[in-house]
Design a protein with these regions (language model features):
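Structural motif at transmembrane-helix junctions in multi-pass transporters
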Residues: 14-20, 70-87, 210-227, 246
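C-terminal transmembrane-helix exit sites in multi-pass transporters
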Residues: 74, 91-110, 233-252
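Glycine-/small-residue-enriched transmembrane alpha-helix faces in small-molecule transporters
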Residues: 1-22, 120-152, 174, 238, ...
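Helix-helix packing/entry segments at the starts of transmembrane helices
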Residues: 86-90, 157-167, 206-241
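Hydrophobic transmembrane alpha-helices of multi-pass small-molecule transport proteins
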Residues: 32, 110-128, 139-141, 250-269
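Hydrophobic alpha-helical transmembrane segments of multi-pass membrane transport proteins
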Residues: 1-4, 8, 59-76, 138-149, ...
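C-terminal-most transmembrane helix of multi-pass membrane proteins
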Residues: 229-286
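Membrane-interface interhelical linkers
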Residues: 30-60, 109, 161, 166-198, ...
Length: 286
């Protein structure tokens, strides 16, 4: 479902991406009000936010996801779908870098090779277009930052997301109000069908994220880890086959190097998993 969001936002390409993000935040906040009310989590949410340092981390997480959403939607409506795919492919490598530089984790040989391949791939892709692939890097860094910050926030997935969109709601309403007077704004120019699409932005945001959070708590990591490549793979195919974005030799080489790096990480994750160890001769039975 997450991978289909590219098609969703592409249908709204005529509107300013900053206005679209403001509506996304507003609609997500409306959905989360309903979710928190139905699940009776207001007291848990407010008590969780009173804990030391939580509000500051929620604000930082909200800003990180705001950057991610904004760059992603801007790129989709301006014809840079392939670069969004690259960004989400790079994100696992960016996560490894954060683990080493911030958390102090050590790099295995396979991950060293993967990181080097990722860096070379970004350089090749940058040279192929004559500029730094800032869309891909911004998406990767913002998504990695968001994931890192979420690990430090002692709130459930539902409470955390609610707190984030509630924090972003006031700026979003200001943006909507400031831009609604323009002739090409959502208020001034949207058709009935486009209004319906925009009104669904909250569900399009909340449902995939909730499903992912649910799976993350119940599905083994060896099964869950490869699924993070599904969304960028869908975006890659959409950008190439549906939206006919250029895929020259340099881009093919760059993407191929990223895929090899991710294959190394995935293979290592599977081989090091307890389930795999139990299947090996001499492994501890479950």
């Amino acid at each position: 479902m997450w991978g289909l969001l590219t098609i969703y936002w592409k249908q709204l390409h005529r509107f300013n991406p900053f206005e679209l993000i403001a509506w996304r935040v507003a609609m997500s906040a409306a959905v989360m009000v309903g979710v928190v009310t139905i699940w009776r989590r207001w007291s848990l949410l407010t008590s969780g936010l009173r804990a030391s340092g939580v509000r500051h981390r929620v604000v930082l997480a909200a800003l990180a996801v705001l950057v991610n959403w904004t760059v992603y939607v801007w790129a989709v409506v301006h014809g840079h779908v392939l670069e969004t795919a690259l960004g989400y492919f790079i994100a696992p490598l960016s996560t490894i870098a954060v683990g080493v530089l911030v958390v102090g984790e050590s790099l295995t040989p396979a991950r060293r090779v993967a990181v080097v391949l990722g860096v070379i791939a970004v350089i090749i892709l940058g040279l192929s277009v004559g500029r730094v692939p800032w869309v891909a890097l911004a998406i990767a860094v913002s998504w990695t930052s968001y994931g890192f910050l979420k690990r430090t926030i002692p709130l459930s997935a539902v409470d955390g997301m609610a707190a984030e969109v509630f924090f972003l709601l006031t700026p979003a309403v200001i943006v909507i109000g400031a831009m609604s007077g323009a002739a090409d704004s959502v208020v001034g120019a949207a058709s009935v069908g486009q209004i319906v699409l925009i009104s669904m932005a909250g569900f399009a945001t909340v449902i995939p994220l909730t499903m992912f959070s649910y799976a993350a708590q119940r599905v083994p990591m060896t099964v869950l880890a490869p699924t993070q490549y599904v969304v960028p793979s869908i975006n890659f195919l959409l950008g190439w086959l549906a939206y006919h974005e250029p895929l020259n030799t340099s881009r093919i080489v760059g993407f191929a190097m990223i895929w090899i790096a991710l294959a190394l990480i995935t293979a290592e994750t599977i081989v090091r998993s307890p389930a795999f160890e139990r299947r090996r001769p001499g492994g501890t039975p479950g």
